Amino acid sequence: MIRIGYRPDWEQFEYRTMDKNYWKAVQYTLLIMYEKGLIYRKKFPVHWCSKCGTALSQAEVGYIQKRGKLYYIKFRITDNEFIEIATTRPELLSACVAIAINPNDERYKNLIGKEVEVPIFGNKVRVLEDNAVDPNFGTGIVMICTYGDEQDIRWQQRYNLPIIPVINEEGKIINSGKYSGMSVIEARKEIVEDLRKLGLITREEEILHNILVHIERSDCMTPIEFIVKDQWFIKSKDFKEEIIEEEEKMNWIPKYMKQRLLEWINNIEWDWVISRQRIFGTPIPFWYCEDCGFIIPPKKEQLPVDTIKDKPPINSCPKCGSNKISGTSDVCDCWVDSSITPLIITRFFEDKTFFNRTYPVDLRQQGHDIIRTWLYYTILRCKIITEVGPFKNVVINGHILGPDGTRMSKSKGNVIMPEEGIEKYGADALRQALLSLTLGSDFPFKWEPVRHGKSFLQKIWSSVRFASQFMMNGEKKINITQLNDIDKWILAKLRNTIAIVDDAMEKYQFHIAVEMLKQFYWHDFCDQYIEAIKPRLYSPISQDDKDNVEAILYKIIWIFIRLLNPICPHIAEEIYHRLFKEREGYISINIAPYPSLDEVPEVDGNNGEKLVDIIASLRSKKVENRMALSALVKKAIIQESKEIIELCKRNEWLLKEVLHINEIEYKEGRREITLIN
């Protein structure tokens, strides 16, 4: 981080989520939320990852597409009458507690109120009507299992259906006769084989379907099961409107990312499961009564607590009188910890004066992949605790992908380490290339922009070395009365650059700032202005004119390196120490004031723009005639408008010196340039 120029204020704002003081802060916020009636514990079907062995929140899971099979299975109504149900999960047959059809599906009106026998297991279940059934999927009939997906949970609660758990925490089948103890995949294979033998599978279709997986961890991606477990929850569904209100107040960069959070909030169906069955983490800071479930909070002065090791503040349950009080081995979801970072850095817990001065914080910068976790949970928790949203600005960045356009992964061999770019091209070239990308979008990593960035840095260095021969000669101020047309042009360009770069940086449009700085310094300053002033430095028409040019050089480079500093801090700091520190007096360029328009005289650069255009045309004509730019031209005939001819005559000495022309002849008319040797 140091090598690439990343230097936050570690001394004031560093924190570690594994420290006891951080645990204390996390537990205190949970105590606040408990006192507001927002923490509860209950049995509920939760998203469960059998590989990680823990419950997950809705934000940690997501759908991926995989190939699979859709099995059409016969369910018996009477001895000679069957219906067909299509499912991708025949291993859940033992958990089937009902059959559902769409009430508008005329094909199955006769089934309403009947019972259907579940194949292999023989239990009978009733037929329900529900509008959520898709009549176009499979046969239009679905089996309701406990639990195959979120829809099964909704139906179970809506119709008060029985619960038959058939998958345990290890991902093994239970309560399913001879299939018990098998993995989900093994049980599916065996049940399908038995159904085939019984003639109960009528057809099998290869399909591409969505599977719910543990998507937050790319090294997991295990299919999710729904397991009924005692878990700890925060009431989050109740705060949808408040969170939407807060996100509307924030300045989003890019603006369209706000929609992602909005869509997530509107799709939240369950309260936040905050407990995790892991070894390490912030302990859930509550005890509970084993008999009635009453929650017993710690006293504030007890924090931090580990309820497995520490004694509760009371010996018996205040609700039922039982002395069976237990702690919990569960730890907090990591987002419970991370969601209070704005409170940590603004010292909410220990310095209210500092907190009131610094909260809400200016900026949250993060990736788009954790909008629905870190960002959402931070807004939720901070809003509940402080009654104010945590951020003024939210900047969402994309990901740098591998050169092949896919996510970087060691297994794919497409990982680009920052050290490689720093060693080869320098940190500033790498920073420049990355800041040239548009915020919010993912980009495959390419070396070409880094190489181009290094070329720009080399251009800066060589131009500064040239200019340093002249611009350090004594204290000089720009004399506005002695500016010629091309001086006015470069100063007008400089003012425009300051304005555009400042505006772009304020709006976090770093790619615009990078492009503008390149355009000004490389093309306007180096390619045009420096080439145009060389005769005035080497063969000055007067000492006053030379002094003015040197003052302009000083002004431009001093302003430019301060504009460049946030993007390329290493070269900016180096140039500052070599050329400017003694005169300007700041210990570092980072302490120097950011450039303002007040530093540059306001002048009209229009004539200079036209003059630069003429110079460019003369150069192009040399190239067209296969002449070196330094080759001597006997005579140039410039055909132009009267206005441009007058401009050229005023600057004829400059044109002759810069373009190595002996004589210039002028004609009125449409632009045409002729070179005669």
Label for each model-derived stretch:
Residues 78, 83-144, 149-154:
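Protease-associated
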Residues 150-159, 192, 371-387, 615-623:
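Metal-dependent nuclease catalytic cores in nucleic-acid-processing enzymes
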Residues 88, 213, 222, 228, ...:
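Auxiliary tRNA-acceptor-end handling modules of aminoacyl-tRNA synthetases
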Residues 1-82, 137-291, 374, 406, ...:
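Residue patterns forming the tRNA-binding/recognition surfaces of aminoacyl-tRNA synthetases
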Residues 83-87, 92-101, 141-144, 224-226, ...:
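Short hydrophobic-aromatic micro-motifs
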Residues 358-369:
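A short glycine/serine-rich beta->alpha loop
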Residues 72, 267-336, 340, 384-427, ...:
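Feature 926 captures the class I aminoacyl-tRNA synthetase adenylation module centered on the KMSKS loop
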Residues 1, 105-132, 161, 222-245, ...:
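Conserved oxyanion/phosphate-binding beta-strand-loop segments in alpha/beta enzyme cores
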